[in-house]
């Protein structure tokens, strides 16, 4: 067990211990080795404190008083402490080998650093002495060129040969020492491998021994814990059995007491029932007397009602006679109205014949216009197809030229990178990394076109729709999808509130349940947000288009109502149907067909519509100013207006007029930057480095050429020396020398070959 209080005490003691001044190494010292040693000591102290805490030991050597605990709990604590100590000892026994190996490795590395330093110093000294000797030899070669006497030249060559032999001997000696040191290191490495294998074998043996020991101790402690639990279980069984017997005795006593109390309550309830029975009989008698009196009163009222019924019957007979006379008068009026209705039927038939003729004429015109429209659409599609073909060809040519130039530029850049890599790795001995440039991964022309949403594309197409043949004629009649010039905030608020009240079906039921506790303004805002999401209204232009559509719809309904009021009341239904038909045609068909229909209206309706169109603007202004009047927009028309608006906004391509396609131009703002970046893959500082390296290599080439010349001169001198030695040998071996008293061989020493 590791109580939290004990941990807090240990941490506090550890902090106080760290806070006290330490005479040993400090972490604030300027020496890095001293700081490292101080940190190691502090970590070791903390680990020792945690080990003591895990073993149940205390820093102050005192043990807190423990509460009374069960045998099983005490046995578990004893087993835990014993096993913890066993594990710590086993771990320490196993890790001692690793610690010793680490110490040996640390000493080996320190010795290796020292020997390496000494070796480097020795090599540096050797290089300096060798360079001095080599400089001395090269200087004597310059002196030898000035000499012309063979004997002096021979002495100089002997001395140079001795110096060269000494230099080579020093180099060979150094090489032998290094080889001997390498051999010693190989032997030491083999010994270290053997030692490591022995350590690993010892660790494995100790680990197996510790595992067996731990398993054995775990089994023993488990047996002790089971025995403690078994004894505690027997004690609990005996104590619980005694408690159960005492509880049964108390329960029996309570049941006996409950039985006596129940008998007393039964007697009391019987007495109360007898009293209640007597009281009910008395109350029944009083109610019976009261009801008999009520029956007598009701019989008297029935006699009065019969008298009233007789009087009312006489009045009804009189009224029947009066109504009969009025019915006769109504039959006469009905016959007159029938004759009038027949005349009106004749008028309706005439109007229907005119209507059928106009419909036929409109259909013929529509067919002719449709054929012209289809012909123009096919021509336009052919033109678009040719245009797309040429655009694709131009783009392919542009892309091919781009890719060709790009491949050539990237090949040159790769060659430059290869040169830079060779310079860094072979000449400078520096690591070289491939530069991560954004333009090297690009393939093909750079595209910076911004993606547009579907709603933006629809708005652009709707705003760019033009029809030069019908633009002037229909600009004032049915431009429902254009933005209004100005709409007051009050008008917009009224329209939005009406839309919010009548379009609740577009809102989810879960959202409606969440909106009930909110205020009215917040509720309206959230409802309108959900409705706009359902209708795909995303910006301010779409909102004002919707408001303008509502206002134009109301103005059109007023004009159609005034036109229909000029005709007789019996053809009101026909005019209403025609107005609705015109509204649907205006929201679903193109503008050209509406021009032909409006031009071919009957002359009688043209006069009425001219008057209506003249007063249309004034009525719109009045209705926009007085939107609170009940004649603004009927709530039943809101769904129709929404349907027409959505149909007009999301109309299919075949029902829309021919749209002008906007030519998409490619953004070439980054082309210059891209090609300039490809041309400048090697920065200016690297070019300066190349120039400096080129100059150094030129100097190095001059030195090599001079060295080659010197080698050729040396070879020629060696050849001359060999010829002179052969001549001298012939001279010394001549027979004339044997006849002389002092032969020439006694005057000088022959050089050894």
Curated annotation (Swiss-Prot):
- The SS bond pairs are none
Q: What is its main location?
A: cytoplasm
UniProt keyword annotation of Coiled coil present: yes
According to its UniProt entry, the protein's GO biological process terms are:
axonemal dynein complex assembly; axoneme assembly; cilium organization; cilium-dependent cell motility; determination of left/right symmetry; flagellated sperm motility; heart development; mucociliary clearance
Q: State where composition is biased (Polar residues).
A: 587-597
Q: Does the keyword Iron apply?
A: no
Instruction: Please list where the region (Disordered) is annotated.
Output: 1-33, 55-76, 587-628
Write out the annotated subcellular location. Cytoplasm, Cytoskeleton, Cilium axoneme; Cytoplasm, Cytoskeleton, Flagellum axoneme
In this record, what's one Pfam family?
NYD-SP28_assoc
What's the protein called, per UniProt? Dynein regulatory complex protein 1
Q: Which gene encodes it?
A: Drc1
């Amino acid at each position: 067990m590791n109580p939290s209080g004990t941990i807090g005490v240990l941490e506090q003691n550890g902090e106080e211990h760290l806070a006290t001044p330490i005479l040993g190494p400090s972490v604030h010292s300027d020496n890095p080795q001293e700081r490292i040693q101080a940190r190691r000591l502090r970590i070791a102290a903390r680990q020792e404190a945690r080990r003591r805490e895990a073993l149940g030991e205390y820093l102050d050597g005192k043990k807190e008083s423990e509460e009374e605990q069960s045998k099983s709990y005490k046995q578990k604590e004893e087993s835990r402490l014993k096993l913890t100590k066993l594990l710590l000892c086993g771990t320490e026994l196993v890790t001692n080998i690793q610690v010793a190996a680490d110490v040996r490795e640390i000493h080996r590395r320190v010795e290796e650093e020292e020997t390496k330093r000494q070796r480097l110093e020795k090599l540096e000294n050797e290089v300096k002495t060798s360079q001095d000797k080599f400089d001395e030899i090269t200087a004597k070669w310059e002196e030898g060129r000035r000499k012309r006497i063979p004997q002096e030249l021979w002495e100089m060559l002997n001395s140079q040969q001795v110096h060269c032999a000494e230099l080579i001997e020093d180099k060979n000696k150094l090489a032998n020492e290094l080889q001997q040191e390498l051999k010693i290191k190989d032997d030491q490495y083999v010994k270290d491998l053997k030692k490591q294998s022995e350590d690993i074998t010892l660790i494995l043996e100790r680990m197996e021994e510790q595992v067996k020991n731990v398993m054995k101790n775990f089994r023993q402690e488990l047996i002790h814990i089971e025995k403690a639990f078994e004894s505690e279980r027997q004690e609990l069984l005996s104590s619980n059995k005694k408690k159960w017997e005492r509880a049964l005795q108390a329960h029996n006593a309570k049941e006996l007491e409950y039985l006596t109390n129940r008998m007393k309550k039964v007697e009391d309830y019987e007495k109360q029932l007898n009293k209640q029975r007597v009281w009910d009989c008395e109350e029944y008698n009083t109610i019976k007397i009261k009801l008999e009196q009520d029956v007598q009163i009701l019989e008297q009222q029935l006699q009065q009602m019969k008298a009233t019924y007789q009087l009312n019957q006489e009045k009804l007979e009189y009224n029947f006679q009066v109504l009969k006379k009025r019915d006769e008068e109504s039959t006469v009026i009905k016959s007159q109205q029938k004759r009038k209705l027949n005349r009106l039927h004749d008028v309706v038939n005439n109007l229907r014949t005119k209507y059928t003729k106009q419909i036929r004429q409109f259909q013929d015109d529509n067919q002719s216009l449709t054929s012209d429209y289809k012909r123009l659409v096919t021509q336009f599609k052919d033109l678009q197809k040719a245009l797309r073909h040429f655009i694709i060809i131009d783009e392919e040519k542009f892309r091919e030229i781009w890719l060709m130039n790009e491949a050539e530029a990237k090949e040159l850049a790769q060659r430059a990178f290869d040169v830079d890599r060779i310079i860094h790795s072979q000449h400078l001995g520096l690591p070289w990394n491939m530069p991560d440039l954004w333009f090297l991964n690009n393939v093909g022309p750079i595209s910076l076109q911004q993606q547009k949403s579907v709603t933006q594309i629809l708005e652009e197409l709707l705003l760019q729709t033009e029809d030069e043949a019908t633009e002037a004629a229909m600009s004032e009649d049915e431009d429902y999808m254009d933005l209004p010039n100005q709409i007051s905030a009050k008008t917009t608020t009224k329209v939005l509130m009406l839309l919010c009240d009548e379009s609740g079906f577009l809102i989810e039921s879960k959202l409606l349940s969440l909106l009930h506790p909110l205020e009215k303004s917040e509720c309206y805002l959230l409802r309108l947000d959900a409705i706009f999401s359902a209708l795909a209204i995303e910006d301010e232009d779409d909102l004002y288009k919707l408001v303008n559509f509502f206002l134009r719809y109301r103005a059109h309904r007023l004009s159609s109502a005034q036109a229909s009021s000029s005709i007789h009341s019996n053809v009101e239904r026909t005019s209403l149907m025609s107005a609705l038909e015109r509204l649907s045609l205006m929201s679903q068909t193109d503008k050209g067909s509406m021009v032909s229909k409006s031009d071919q209206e009957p002359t009688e309706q043209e006069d009425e519509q001219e008057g209506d169109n003249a007063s249309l603007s004034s009525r719109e202004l009045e209705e926009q100013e007085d939107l609170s009047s009940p004649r603004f927009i009927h709530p039943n028309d809101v769904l129709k207006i929404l349907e027409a608006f959505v149909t007009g906004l999301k109309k299919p391509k075949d029902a829309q007029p021919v749209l002008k396609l906007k030519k998409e131009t490619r953004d070439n703002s980054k082309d210059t930057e891209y090609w300039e970046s490809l041309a400048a893959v090697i920065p200016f500082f690297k070019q300066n480095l190349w120039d400096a390296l080129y100059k150094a290599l030129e100097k190095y080439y001059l030195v090599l050429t001079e060295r080659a010349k010197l080698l050729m001169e040396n070879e020629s001198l060696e050849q001359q020396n060999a010829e002179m030695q052969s001549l001298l040998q012939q001279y010394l071996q001549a027979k004339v020398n044997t006849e002389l008293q002092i032969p020439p061989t006694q005057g000088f020493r022959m050089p050894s070959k």
